[in-house]
Amino acid sequence: WDYIGSPTNVIMVISTSLMLFAGRFGLAPSANR
């Protein structure tokens, strides 16, 4: 869990997960369209 220790990595992981969830649920216009 060393790579999740820094706040920047946490923000990156959260933003990436949000992008993936948005793409799956169709909330991101650029993901499905």
Curated annotation (Swiss-Prot):
Location (main, coarse): plastid
Biological process, per Gene Ontology: photosynthesis
Alphabetized InterPro entries for the sequence: PSI_PsaG/PsaK_dom (IPR023618)
Gene3D superfamilies with a match to the protein in the record: Chlorophyll a-b binding protein like
Record's keyword terms, sorted: Chloroplast, Membrane, Photosynthesis, Photosystem I, Plastid, Thylakoid, Transmembrane, Transmembrane helix
Location in the cell: Plastid, Chloroplast thylakoid membrane
GO annotation, cellular component aspect: chloroplast thylakoid membrane; photosystem I
Membrane topology of the entry: Multi-pass membrane protein
Transmembrane spans: 3-23
Keyword field contains Transmembrane helix: yes
Family: Belongs to the PsaG/PsaK family.
Protein name from the UniProt record: Photosystem I reaction center subunit psaK, chloroplastic
